[in-house]
Design a protein with these regions (language model features):
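Generic structural signal for short, solvent-exposed loop/turn connectors between secondary structure elements
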Residues: 1-10, 24-35, 48-56, 122-132, ...
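A diffuse structural propensity rather than consistent per-protein peaks
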Residues: 73-84, 101, 188-195, 334, ...
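Transmembrane and membrane-interface helices of multi-pass
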Residues: 1-168
């Protein structure tokens, strides 16, 4: 009797909380409608299966509560609202290592599983309704699903949903609008109303850069979770990798925070923003990659380059090997295949391989493929990724600026950045020693998730400062400098044309446009001329069919 009363109280609480979520968290009437529809779809499905009223109310309430909480977790760890197709990533066991990185998440998952268990099995001994009433549950389920499908397909609903970007506060509407065709699983290229004529005319006004037969070896190094730590509030000294002479340097807008590295990989390799793919922006490696017509590796291959990707994860992780192949990478290499230090005895996720060890791996690639030069090597290091729990004490006077939790995380972050800097400088010294033309570029895919706020970054003049990282290029004497102020904000999607210009490599039609946009505005999403911005995107997607192969 006591257990039953406790269960009823438990169910009542979840029902009331779920109703608060549905009726309170809405920016549009359609968000409310979708929340109500989802609740009654879940209720009807469970009632048809079990014929038990209380069990069905309990099930619908808890599942709706869990969806809301998963959305909060997504916002905290990835700074991204939950979409229905995100569950494809969450259910892929290759991505479950996040539970090891963030042990508090494991506890949350256990709690969620417990709640779902209670949602499914509680009140299973209650009296069941007769068959007619259960069939009414099936009929109402069918009607509700049809109504849901119809509403989500209406143009006015899509328009209202798009108005909620980028905040996307309507949890249940976001889920509804990313189910089925709206999710991008039935692939459709982005389109911008064929408004490309303006940009098409402007391209002809841009002076082309010098093209030669220099053909430098190119290394593009993704520094995981990296932003020059001296940009954070405090008195952290700038490490050596961000000092000295550069062939090019800039701050860039990126389209992810704290994770989902593949979004920045997609951007720097294709010259396209993942956000253009809307609800499927987190799945660009799975659903957009096969349709990409142009890419930096493809352009380089046309000019005689052999293209290689070095990744500390197996090729199955986030579909990376297949995606790289779609982008024109000739060969995918895991450090284990080269018997690199820290690579272990089999191909697996190397979350703790150091950046110095990854740099040594690239040196082995140069030796192994000496006869296939010029080489383009795309690599990424992982050691700088969260969680930042290795520091034993707060250092660098950070406790004067942050609470203890953030101070110790930033201490760990900075200590890892010091080691990364040593690896970067060491590798650049190696490239110098080859006595061959080279370009060595390195950049941050996103900032690390340390619980910092916008005002903890010294970017007062920029919106969304947590979505900004740096891009730095060193090179041999024959590589001519592109003069640029570091604080002149650009975008990661424009960086492929930087590498082509530095290498004096002939661009294809896509990267001619990429170069022109960089010269005209130097930004994409932050470009002040919104008419130019739309025309540029239309030129890429509507005129060149860049994502419609």
């Amino acid at each position: 009797m006591i257990i039953r009363r406790a269960s009823i109280i438990f169910t009542t609480i979840f029902f009331l909380v779920t109703m608060i979520f549905i009726f309170n968290y809405k920016d549009t009437i359609f968000a409310l409608i979708f929340g109500i529809l989802q609740f009654f779809i879940l209720f009807s499905a469970m009632f048809f299966i079990t014929g038990q009223w209380l069990r069905s109310i309990n099930f619908a309430s808890i599942v709706m509560f869990v969806l809301f909480m998963i959305n909060r977790l997504s916002l905290y760890y990835y700074r991204k609202a939950l979409f229905a197709n995100d569950f494809l990533l969450y259910l892929d066991y290759e991505n479950w290592d996040i539970l090891i990185d963030f042990k508090e998440l494991l506890l949350v998952v256990i709690i969620i599983l417990f709640l779902l268990g209670f949602a499914i099995f509680a009140y299973s001994k209650n009296e069941k309704a007769n068959l007619k009433l259960r069939m009414s549950g099936l009929i109402s389920l069918i009607i509700l699903v049809l109504v849901h499908t119809k509403i989500e397909s209406l143009d006015i609903v899509k328009s209202e949903w798009l108005k909620t970007f980028p905040e996307l506060k309507n949890t249940y509407m976001n889920i509804s609008m990313t189910i089925g065709n709206n999710s991008g699983l039935d692939y459709k290229s982005p389109t911008f109303n064929n408004s490309y004529e303006m940009f098409k005319n402007k391209i002809n006004t841009v002076t082309n850069y010098e093209i030669s037969n220099l053909k430098p070896n190119i290394v593009l190094w993704l520094n995981e979770s990296t932003l020059d730590a001296s940009f954070y509030r405090g008195n952290l000294e700038q490490v050596d990798m961000f000092k000295g002479d550069f062939k090019f340097q800039t701050l860039n807008r990126v389209h992810t925070f704290g994770g989902k590295t593949w979004k920045s990989e997609f951007e720097v390799l294709t010259g396209l923003s993942p956000d253009e793919f809307g609800a499927s922006s987190s799945l660009v490696f799975q659903y957009a990659a096969p349709h990409i017509k142009y890419s930096l590796p493809k352009n380089l291959k046309e000019e005689g380059y052999y293209t290689i990707a070095l990744n500390p994860y197996p090729g199955s992780a986030y579909n990376s090997k297949n995606a790289y192949k779609n982008f024109g990478i000739d060969e995918y290499i895991h450090p284990n295949e080269l018997k690199c230090d820290g690579a272990g005895d089999k191909i697996r996720k190397l979350k703790y391989i150091t950046s110095m060890q990854m740099g040594e791996c690239v040196k082995k690639i140069f030796k192994k493929y000496e006869n296939k030069q010029p080489l383009f090597i795309y690599m990424l290091t992982i050691n700088e990724h969260a969680p930042y729990n290795r520091a034993k004490e707060v250092k660098f006077g950070l406790n004067e600026f942050y609470d203890e939790s953030q101070s110790i995380k930033l201490t760990d972050y900075y200590e890892r950045q010091i080691e990364l800097s040593k690896a970067v400088i060491n590798f650049n010294d190696f490239m110098l020693s080859t006595n061959k033309p080279y370009i060595f570029a390195y950049f941050g895919d996103h900032q690390g998730n340390m619980g910092l706020k916008n005002n903890d970054v010294k970017f007062n003049n920029f919106t969304n400062p947590l979505n900004i990282t740096g891009f730095y290029v060193k090179g041999s004497n024959g590589v001519k400098e592109i003069k640029n102020n570091l604080m002149n904000l650009s975008e990661l999607s424009l960086m492929p044309s930087v590498l082509l210009e530095l290498g004096q490599i002939k661009p294809n039609d896509f990267f001619k446009a990429n170069y022109a946009m960089r010269k005209i505005c130097n930004k994409v999403d932050d470009c002040e001329d919104k008419e130019l911005l739309e025309s540029y995107k239309s030129y890429l997607y509507d005129y060149l069919n860049a994502a419609n192969k």
